[in-house]
Design a protein with these regions (language model features):
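C-terminal cap/substrate-recognition subdomain and adjoining C-terminal extension
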Residues: 79-93, 100-239
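Alpha-helical substrate-recognition element adjacent to the catalytic core
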Residues: 2-112, 116-121
């Protein structure tokens, strides 16, 4: 039977070269307050949703044109578009799952001719008082490290006989990887996988990911990650 792979990719710091969400608040928010909020999030003192609400409150009198110019100045990984083509060619469904915001993801994807990519994220609008107003359509209180519950998107978009691949780099991915068969990690996510002894493949760009997936696809026998299967089963039972 032909192997079916479902690919799930983080956005900030994985597709984009910088964490755009964090960079926006560091540039336009109150620096001291922003630093304090991020420290609390990384030390699990507040949830992802609480951090986003506080970060948005730290920004006053935002200039929309300045924000757009700033977003436009941040590049994506130059190998990502080729990776998207690779997934299409090999009929592997690709989902972008981000704890960031649709406001800048839409802008980046339009710029890079990637508007057809399916993605899930939090929502962000600029109101009449030039304030950032976030909303969280995919919030799950079990997913405290991500206001957009990435775990649920993975479980809802993959079946028992399909292999799940996750590609990410950061804090919002820590809970997510526990439910995936194959993990590509860098930066903070890589450190987390090492500490928690979760098997992963290190990567620097999507060309390296492509080469490894080719290897996985060529294996005659490919095992799903047992601990991930147990975790997924727990979710089904608890529901």
């Amino acid at each position: 039977m032909e192997k079916v792979f479902k690919i799930f990719v983080d956005f900030d710091g994985t597709i984009s070269k910088q964490d755009i969400g964090e960079a926006i608040f560091r540039k336009f928010g109150n620096p001291e307050r922003v630093e304090n909020i991020i420290e609390k999030l990384l030390s699990d003192k507040i949830t992802a949703k609480e951090s986003w609400l506080s970060l948005c409150e730290s920004v006053e009198n935002l200039d929309k044109n300045e924000l757009n110019e700033f977003i436009d100045s941040i590049d994506i990984d130059e190998t990502f578009c080729n990776f998207v083509d690779y997934c299409k060619k090999n009929e592997m469904e690709l989902f972008v799952i981000s704890d960031g915001f649709n406001y800048y993801i839409d802008r980046v994807f339009e710029r890079e001719n990637l508007k057809d990519l399916k993605y899930y994220s939090n929502k962000l609008v600029i109101d009449s008082n030039n304030k950032l107003v976030p909303s969280f359509p995919y919030l799950d209180h079990n997913c405290t490290s991500s206001a957009n519950c990435k775990r649920n998107h993975i479980i809802n978009n993959s079946g028992e006989d399909e292999y799940t691949i996750f590609i990410g780099d950061g804090n919002s991915d820590k809970y997510t990887v526990q439910f995936c068969d194959f993990i590509f990690a860098k930066d903070d996510l890589l450190k987390y996988c090492e500490i928690e002894r979760i098997t992963y493949f290190p990567f620097n760009n999507f060309n390296e990911v492509t080469a490894k997936i080719d290897e996985l696809r060529s294996r005659k026998r490919l095992k799903k990650r047992y601990q991930a299967e147990l975790k997924r089963r727990e979710v089904y039972i608890n529901e």
